[in-house]
């Protein structure tokens, strides 16, 4: 292709994207086809990767194809393993793409499609992808060191020490939440559990095939693995229909929680080429395959975006799906769909230890985040093609809308979104569920959206239930890969912390030390997971509200670290690349964090619903009222009921108090990183650059 034709092609892509983007932003009144959103997103991602991604890669970071990576220098066949670019892309994408891009945009859709679309597209290209890419780069230049360890090396021991503890706490919360989503999806689901279980032996076979049987034959292993995965999905439905096998593969949530912990431990201590990398690569086939099929199906089916462009009546935070104003909580709620701190832990965890060539970081780091942003766009479409009345029926709590279909329809219609009981019951029957009312959390909405789109092309109404349950399975597989990779990254983090106490424990090549660190990691997130599995109001459910804020604070810290390193590298003129998104993320997140620790304010329902401190006051008063009531009744049945209510209120009080304390601690850690960044950038704090010595790649031969 000639230079002129290339320029014409990119001009066409840019023009097409701008037209579709502008149409979505400016259209008023009439419904808009989802095709415009798909086309706008694809064009923006193409432009972002080709121009901005390459600018960051070769102007800002100056990637060097001749520089040896830690995977080559430290190759130990377990954690440090040079990995094919396509396989590593699959591993990294599977590891970072958890519940966030599926759930966040669906919840944020209550504000309308335009605010979410703007942040997912702009934030994904200019903030999230840059964040992932730059952290992967700086970790690769530092022997694959973890985020906390790099903050300690580059920004000071005290700041780094506090940050390491905060990052570890955030990591435990994130992994436990991801694991709980998987447990909820697979509990009582023999089809899903069988299919997920089968990906393990398939991945092990692929790992052995690519390393010993046919070294380097990634294409062959990919075809075999993909065929076996499709067979596993098919026979999962056969297993579910068989009474004997269905019973074997039907597990309750507490049992599944234990299985998840065992799997997380084993996957984290085995050599990365044996299970983790091939399984993530295999999962990526399904993940990207479903997203591509969804995009094509949307173009063919052309569903309308029925959600209004902007639900301005909920911008003040009074929306029924989540409390909090459009600023800052839209950004915090969307989270991973635009930028995620969890990605920094993977980009400084497993991935830099597997990067075969430094130039691969562009595709692996920047490209993977754009792929995740595309997932977020698909999730947003799944929510917005629903009738708004159905959307709110699914995502509003039963305490707000009730449980009777007629009353639910009346309540939601009174909000201005007309819906009939028949529309609710018809959809419920079509997807084979008992009810769709108050199926909060985002996952059911995504599955319904997938079913509504795909049944138009494959099978009609008769197969809507199949596509719905397939989407639930897809979500479980989508999220599980983030759990095993997250646990491995958490192990590196624990070893960094233990290494400050006893140096041999910090050696990641030390197998016994790795086993101890993995056990501590799994015990940490596993405790919260198991408690949540046996008590729907305990364990990780207590810490769930902290996910969004803590995750975004982590992203802000990572971007400030990157800014500091750019200054030390003599690239201060390029610091806007990381500093601008850091400021945007931290202003929104710290403002949200402050709102979460504000005291109770009489008559301010939105502020009180957001604040953990206000919730503590509300629950304390509730406990006092219940205790007074308890002391003035003699009815045994009523006494039992009141005691139960006191127990629940006490649990809520303790949970919110813990959230408030952790929120303050995370903000303090973030402020320390901000202060250190400012001090270093202004030359007030002198800490030398800790980049590893340059070693030419031709000194090593891939093992």
What are these regions (language model features)?
Residues 298-314, 370-448, 485, 530-538:
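Extracellular/periplasmic helix-exit of transmembrane alpha-helices
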Residues 35-42, 47, 51-60, 166, ...:
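Membrane-interface loop-to-helix entry segments
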Residues 1-15, 47-102, 284, 325, ...:
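Membrane-interface "cap" regions at the ends of multi-pass membrane proteins
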Residues 31-50, 108-139, 148, 193-199, ...:
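Extracellular loop-to-transmembrane helix junctions
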Residues 154-172, 367-374, 440-442, 461-471, ...:
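Loop-to-transmembrane helix boundary motifs in multi-pass membrane proteins
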Residues 53-81, 107, 117, 121, ...:
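Flexible loop linkers connecting adjacent transmembrane helices
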Residues 22-28, 32-33, 79-142, 153-157, ...:
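Membrane-interface helix-loop-helix modules in multi-pass membrane proteins
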